[in-house]
Amino acid sequence: MIFGTGIDIVDITRFERFLEERNTRLFERLFTIHEQEYCAGKAHSAQHYALRFAAKEAFLKACGLGLREGLTWHDVEVVNDSLGKPDLRLYGKAQQLFADMNLSKTFVSLSHDGNFAVAMVVLERV
């Protein structure tokens, strides 16, 4: 059964600007080291950062919480399987809330066009 859905859209040019400004503190606050390494290794890294940020926001919306209840940006990590399919890896408070809400699965869709990155997250309950 579907528990919640969340969607978020991000302007990629914001992340292009953050990269140009070399705003490393922002990236360290928003993204895990694995996400930073993944994005930095891509030709269009701003696009990949924007997609990951949108997915984190979409997850928070799907939970109906926002960034509160002790959650941090590092509690939600966007990962890809061997075929490139995106998914979420949860840590800390996000993992605890996921279990407390009896959630069983996340579904993630990422897309981009022009200057925009969009993510949708669906949460399933057992």
Curated annotation (Swiss-Prot):
Biological processes per GO annotation: fatty acid biosynthetic process
Stated role: Transfers the 4'-phosphopantetheine moiety from coenzyme A to a Ser of acyl-carrier-protein.
Keyword Oxidoreductase: no
Protein name as it appears in the record: Holo-[acyl-carrier-protein] synthase
Major localization listed first in the record, in broad terms: cytoplasm
SUPFAM superfamilies: 4'-phosphopantetheinyl transferase (SSF56214)
Cellular compartments annotated: Cytoplasm
Taxonomic superkingdom: Bacteria
E.C. number: 2.7.8.7
Enzyme class: transferase
GO cellular component terms listed in the entry, alphabetical order: cytoplasm
One Pfam family hit: ACPS
Species of origin: Geobacter metallireducens (strain ATCC 53774 / DSM 7210 / GS-15)
HAMAP family membership: AcpS
Binding site for Mg(2+): 8, 57
Family affiliation: Belongs to the P-Pant transferase superfamily. AcpS family.
Cofactor: Mg(2+)
